[in-house]
C-alpha cells in the first residue's frame, strides 16, 4: 500500500508508524565500537550488484555497454521514482570521482561504495550465513533481480530525503523508461519460466529481509527541490565534480563518504527483530532544524573568533569595530604603562633640587639719623659681605625639622627621587668665634671700615637662630631687597659702646649719643603660624589719645598717630579710631554695663565733651576741614 503525501511533510518522505512504548529499563552502558573497517547492508548490496553486473557485462556486447543516450545527457530532467511498500531509508551523498574507489556500476546504472570493514557482520553469524547464500544465488543467477521483486516495484512516487529525484527502476538495476535496455530486459523477463522467476523472487525477498534487519545509520539530509536533477551534490566541496565515467545513465546515487570524519556505521545492533514495517524517524521538525542550524553557526563563529578558555580571558573580537572613546582610553593607558616602564628601567638615583631663596640670620644695624640713604646701603652691604667672608653654615630643614646628622645619606634622611621635594628648606647661619659668645662675633676678628664712609658709625650684630631651627621663628628671616618691609620702633640708646660690645663695625665717634636702631625687615608673605597679640590700651595710652583728639579733632587720626603714638609701632591709626569709638560708647552707658579694664570717669567725661565739641564744629563748617583748636575745658 502506498502512503499518501501529507501536507505537513510535503516532499520529505514517509511518515513513520507509531512505535509502541516499552517499559523503561535500567540504563545500560554501551561500548562504542570501532567505526573503521565495517561492512553495512548497502555495501553488501553493492557487492552483490557488482558480481551480478560483472557477469552480465561478460555476456553482453562490449561496444554498446557504455553508450549513453544523448537526449538524457542534454535534458537531465528529473523523473519520479518508484515508492516501495516497505522501503528502508538510505543515507547518501553525491558520488565524486575521487571517492568512487571500489565502486562498480553496470549497464543498469547502480552506484555504491565498498566498505573495507566487516566487524559488524562478523558479530552476527546468522546474518553472515544468509548473506553468503544470497550472494551465491546472485552469482549463479545474474538476472536474479526480477520484475516483481522489491527493486522492480512499479508504484510511482518520489523519495523525499532531499536528494532530488531518482529515475524509474527497471527489472535489472536502474534504467530509464525511454532506453532500449529496458525493453530488452522486459523481453528477457517474460521469456523466463515461472519456476525460475519464483526462485528469483524468493532470493530477492531474502535479500530484502537481510537488508531490513540491519541497523542502518541514517541521518536527515539536506533538502532539495523536486525539480532538481538526480544526483544533487549536498556538500560544498563536491560541486563541480563529475560522476564516475563507468556510470552509464549519469545517475548519481548518494552514499556515505569513505573517510573517517563522516563515516557512519552499525554502532549498535538492531533490536527491531522481525518488525519489518518499522522505519526510524530521523527527520525532525522545524524547531529542531533551526536549533541545529544556530548551533552550527555558533560553533563556526567560536572557531573563527576564538573561544574563552577561562573566565579571566577575553573573547577576541572578530571583524568588530571598537568605539573611538574606548580606543583612545586604551591608547592612553598603554602610553602610561610604557612611560612607567621606561622610568622604572632607569637606574639613575639623582635628586634634583631647586633653591629659590635662602633664609639669612637676623641683622641688627644701628646708624645715626643724620646718615644718608647711600651710607645705609653701604653699611648693610659691608656687613653682609663680612658675614659671607667670615663663613656661613648651611642648615637643611625637611618638613620643618632640622637635619643635624651630616653622615646620613639622602635616602636615609628622606630625600629621594620619588618623594615631593617642596618641603625642603635651606638656612644660612653665621659661624661664631671660638673665644666669643655663640651668638656674637668679636669685633677684633672682623675687618674694619674706614671712618670716612659714614658720618657716624653703625653697629651690626649677627645672631644665630634659636635651637629648634623652625625657620627662624624666634628670629624670623628677612630679604634685604624687599621693598614692602615694616620697620620696628626706634630705640634710643644713651649708653656708650665699648670695645667689647656686640659690634662688627666699630664707631668712628664713641661719644655719639643718638643712634638709630634699624630693625630687621619682614616679608610680605603672611605668616599663618603667628597671630597678632592683643594688647589692650592702658590708662596712660587712653589719656594720650584723649588729649590728642581734644587738640586735633576726630577726623585727623593720622595726625593723632604721629602726635601721641609716633614711637609705638603696634598702635596704628585704625586702632586709635576704633578705641575712640569704644570710649564714646563706654561713656554713654551705665557703669554696670561696662566691661573690660576700668577707665576713670574723669577721662570718660572728657571723651563725651570732646566728641560733642568736634561734632558741633563740623556741623557749623558744613563739611569743611576743622581748624585745629584746643578744646575748651
UniProtKB/Swiss-Prot annotation:
Superkingdom to which the source organism belongs: Eukaryota
One Gene Ontology molecular-function label: protein homodimerization activity
Residue ranges constituting the SANT domain according to the UniProt record: 534-584
Segments forming domain HTH myb-type: 529-588
Tissue distribution: Ubiquitous.
UniProt main location, coarse: nucleus
Sequence ranges of Polar residues compositional bias: 263-272
Region (Disordered) location: 253-272
Region of interest (Sufficient for telomeric DNA binding), residue spans: 506-615
DNA-binding region per UniProt: 557-584
Keyword tags: Chromosome, DNA-binding, Telomere
Record-linked InterPro entries: Homeodomain-like_sf (IPR009057), Myb_dom (IPR017930), SANT/Myb (IPR001005), TRP_plant (IPR031105), Ubiquitin-like_dom (IPR000626), Ubiquitin-like_domsf (IPR029071)
Location(s) in or outside the cell: Chromosome, Telomere
GO CC aspect terms: chromosome, telomeric region
SMART domains xref list: SANT
A biological-process GO annotation: regulation of telomere maintenance
UniProt note: phenotype after gene disruption: Severe developmental abnormalities of vegetative organs and impaired reproductive organ formation. Chromosomal fusion in mother pollen cells. Increased telomere length and frequency of anaphase bridges containing telomeric repeat DNA.
Residues annotated as domain Ubiquitin-like: 351-430
General function of this protein: Binds the telomeric double-stranded 5'TTTAGGG-3' repeat and regulates telomere length and structure.
Alphabetical list of PANTHER family matching this protein: TELOMERE-BINDING PROTEIN 1 (PTHR21717:SF72), TELOMERIC REPEAT BINDING PROTEIN (PTHR21717)
Subunit relationships: Homodimer.
Protein name listed in UniProt: Telomere-binding protein 1
Designated gene of the protein: TBP1
Amino acid at each position: 500500500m502506498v502512503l499518501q503525501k501529507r501536507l505537513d511533510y510535503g516532499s520529505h518522505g514517509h511518515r513513520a508508524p507509531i512505535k509502541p512504548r516499552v517499559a523503561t529499563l535500567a540504563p545500560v552502558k554501551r561500548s562504542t565500537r570501532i567505526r573503521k573497517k565495517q561492512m553495512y547492508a548497502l555495501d553488501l548490496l553493492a557487492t552483490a550488484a557488482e558480481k551480478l553486473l560483472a557477469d552480465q557485462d561478460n555476456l553482453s556486447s562490449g561496444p554498446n555497454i557504455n553508450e549513453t543516450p544523448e537526449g538524457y545527457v542534454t535534458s537531465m530532467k528529473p523523473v519520479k521514482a518508484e515508492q516501495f511498500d516497505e522501503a528502508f531509508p538510505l543515507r547518501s551523498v553525491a558520488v565524486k570521482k575521487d571517492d568512487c574507489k571500489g565502486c562498480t556500476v553496470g549497464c543498469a546504472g547502480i552506484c555504491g561504495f565498498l566498505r573495507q570493514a566487516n566487524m559488524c557482520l562478523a558479530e552476527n553469524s546468522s546474518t553472515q550465513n544468509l548473506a553468503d547464500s544470497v550472494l551465491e544465488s546472485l552469482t549463479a543467477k545474474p538476472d536474479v533481480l526480477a520484475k516483481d521483486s522489491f527493486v522492480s516495484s512499479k508504484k510511482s512516487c518520489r523519495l523525499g530525503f532531499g536528494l532530488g529525484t531518482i529515475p524509474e527502476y527497471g527489472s535489472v538495476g536502474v534504467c530509464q523508461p525511454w532506453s532500449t535496455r529496458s525493453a530488452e530486459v522486459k523481453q528477457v523477463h517474460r521469456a523466463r519460466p515461472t519456476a525460475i522467476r519464483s526462485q528469483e523472487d524468493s532470493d530477492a525477498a531474502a535479500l530484502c529481509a537481510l537488508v531490513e534487519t540491519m541497523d542502518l545509520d541514517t541521518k536527515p539530509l539536506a533538502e532539495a527541490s523536486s525539480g532538481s536533477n538526480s544526483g544533487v551534490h549536498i556538500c560544498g566541496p563536491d560541486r563541480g565534480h563529475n560522476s564516475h565515467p563507468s556510470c552509464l545513465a549519469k545517475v548519481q546515487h548518494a552514499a556515505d563518504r569513505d573517510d573517517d570524519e563522516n563515516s557512519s556505521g552499525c554502532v549498535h545492533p538492531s533490536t527491531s527483530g522481525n518488525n519489518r514495517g518499522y522505519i526510524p524517524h530521523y527527520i525532525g521538525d522545524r524547531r529542531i532544524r533551526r536549533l541545529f542550524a544556530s548551533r552550527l553557526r555558533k560553533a563556526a563563529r567560536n572557531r573563527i573568533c576564538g573561544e574563552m578558555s577561562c573566565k579571566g580571558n577575553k573573547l577576541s573580537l572578530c571583524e568588530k569595530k571598537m568605539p573611538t572613546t574606548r580606543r583612545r582610553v586604551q591608547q592612553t593607558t598603554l602610553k602610561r604603562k610604557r612611560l612607567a616602564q621606561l622610568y622604572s628601567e632607569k637606574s639613575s638615583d639623582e635628586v634634583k633640587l631647586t633653591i629659590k631663596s635662602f633664609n639669612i640670620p637676623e641683622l641688627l644695624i644701628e646708624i645715626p639719623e643724620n646718615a644718608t640713604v647711600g651710607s645705609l646701603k653701604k653699611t648693610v652691604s659691608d656687613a653682609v659681605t663680612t658675614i659671607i667672608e667670615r663663613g656661613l653654615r648651611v642648615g637643611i630643614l625637611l618638613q620643618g625639622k632640622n637635619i643635624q646628622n651630616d653622615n646620613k645619606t639622602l635616602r636615609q634622611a628622606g630625600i629621594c627621587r620619588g618623594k615631593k621635594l617642596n618641603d625642603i628648606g635651606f638656612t644660612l647661619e653665621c659661624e661664631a668665634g671660638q673665644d666669643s659668645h655663640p651668638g656674637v662675633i668679636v669685633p677684633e676678628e672682623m675687618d674694619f671700615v674706614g671712618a670716612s664712609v659714614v658720618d657716624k658709625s653703625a653697629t651690626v650684630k649677627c645672631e644665630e637662630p634659636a635651637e629648634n631651627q623652625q625657620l627662624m621663628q624666634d628670629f624670623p628671616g628677612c630679604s634685604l631687597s624687599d621693598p614692602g618691609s615694616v620697620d620696628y620702633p626706634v630705640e634710643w640708646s644713651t649708653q656708650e659702646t665699648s670695645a667689647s660690645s656686640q659690634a662688627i663695625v666699630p664707631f668712628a665717634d664713641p661719644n655719639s649719643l643718638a643712634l638709630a636702631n634699624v630693625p630687621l625687615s619682614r616679608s610680605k608673605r603672611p605668616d599663618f603660624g603667628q597671630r597678632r597679640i592683643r594688647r589692650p590700651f592702658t590708662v596712660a595710652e587712653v589719656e594720650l589719645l584723649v588729649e590728642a583728639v581734644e587738640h586735633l579733632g576726630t577726623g585727623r587720626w593720622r595726625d593723632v598717630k604721629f602726635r601721641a603714638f609716633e614711637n609705638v609701632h603696634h598702635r596704628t591709626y585704625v586702632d586709635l579710631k576704633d578705641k575712640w569709638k569704644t570710649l564714646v560708647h563706654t561713656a554713654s552707658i551705665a557703669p554696670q554695663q561696662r566691661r573690660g579694664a576700668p577707665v576713670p570717669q574723669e577721662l570718660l567725661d572728657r571723651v563725651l565733651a570732646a566728641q560733642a565739641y568736634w561734632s558741633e564744629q563740623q556741623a557749623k563748617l558744613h563739611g569743611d576741614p576743622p581748624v585745629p583748636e584746643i578744646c575748651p575745658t
